[in-house]
Every structure is written in C-alpha cells, then in structure tokens.
Amino acid sequence: MKEKDIGNLQHTTWRCQYHIVFAPKYRRLAIYGQIKKDVGQILRKLCEQKGVEIIEAEACPDHIHMLISIPPKYSVSQIMGYLKGKSSLMIFDRHANLKYKYGDRHFWARGYYVDTVGRNKKQIQEYIRSQLEEDKIADQISIKEFIDPFTGSKNSKA
C-alpha cells in the first residue's frame, strides 16, 4: 500500500476505494457537450463537500465511471444517494429543457454498480480511462448498412 492511498482520521487509518458506475434514466445518451462539463463540475463539487476523493473518472454518453475513495464515516449507499440526488437537482437547474425528457426530475436511473478496489487499482484506472474510446468503437461496430431489396442500394437505417 502506498501512503497516499491511506486516509487518516483522528483514531482511524483507512483505505476505502470503490469503482462505481451509474447511468442516466432510461440509459439515454444524455451526457455530452455542456451537460457533460456540468455533470463533471457538479460531481467534483459534491464529492469535495463530503470529503470524497475522485481518483479517476470518465463520463461516457450513457453512463459514468468513478474510482473514488470514501471516508469510513459514510457508506457507499449514503454517498451515492447524495451524489445522484443532489446532482439531479443541480443538472435540472442548469438545463431546464431536460424536464421534458425526465419529467419527474430524476436524471439518474435507479441503482448503480459498485465494486471494491484492492490490488487491482491500476487495472481499474486503465479500464475507466479506456471506456469512452471503447464505447465509440462499439457504436461504430453496431452501425449496420442495410441493402434495399428493391433497388440494391445501401441504406444506413432499417
């Protein structure tokens, strides 16, 4: 263990690191452009307020990956409830037009993925860094060219 990975409180020494993934409601491709910048700023600000360190993060169009260190006074579910709840309100304040897509002011889908980080921290950091590029490649692979049976010409949509 490296010293910088270990946190200290008055009577506690700790290293509580988690890989967390969560997505917008309906897994919509909503995190791009100005919204992506705002989501990043909002999540950084909220984490800072709770003393949560963001070690690595990536915002893909349809989900967020975060490698974070949470102080032991908070549970993962407390932090996720706080991040998703507060960030939803802040996102809707900055982007009022989203209320037409997400009428109930819930920007994030219910639930999230969480995994503890142990000795595989470097692999998880690399995985998070590569996610955006892998998503782009997967999107390009999934683009199908359809041939019109009557004309024989290629169509890009079904």
Please provide the spans of the model-predicted regions.
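Basic nucleic-acid-binding interfaces
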Residues: 1-158
